[in-house]
Amino acid sequence: MTTSCPPPSISDREEQARILCLRLLTARSRTRAQLFGQLAKRGYADHVSERVLDRLAAVGLLDDNDFAEQWVRSRRANVGKSKRALAADLRAKGIDSEVITTVLAGIDPAVERERAEQLVRTRLRREVLSEDDARVSRRLMAMLARRGYSQTTICEVVVAELAAERERRRV
């Protein structure tokens, strides 16, 4: 049985850090900052962590740009998060501001508003409308606020979609 031997220039500690990073990356994609945090949490020295992470980036296993693009695509499609909420999520994951700006530059405000309208329409189908729209309105506004939409967008979309749903149910 043959085993792969690490190059002689790599210390045992670096090899352990590399194996840990590979195991973490096997589970799911992660940012450089997240991996650095995991290595620090387990007591690896900063210089060891930097060398391992630089090597992973050099071979293409660690790419914050790619991570950010995938994250934005996934969260917009599945959760319906706004540009502002996505930026906050990426900042929390340790992505650079320049990368965040680049990735979010492609989001069109009209498409974002359309997604908010779609979310409200979907939720309204399940709501029972009574004479008092305040409860339904409050719930819809809270849903959009949790997804990071601006107050202006929230108010405009909820008022318009509530009126459209009332008209649709009247017919």
From Swiss-Prot:
Gene3D superfamilies: Winged helix-like DNA-binding domain superfamily/Winged helix DNA-binding domain. It is found in: Cytoplasm. One of its GO terms (biological process) is regulation of DNA repair. Pfam families: RecX_HTH1 (PF21982), RecX_HTH2 (PF02631), RecX_HTH3 (PF21981). GO terms for cellular component: cytoplasm. Belongs to the RecX family. HAMAP family: RecX (MF_01114). PANTHER family: REGULATORY PROTEIN RECX FAMILY PROTEIN (PTHR33602:SF1). Modulates RecA activity. This is Regulatory protein RecX.
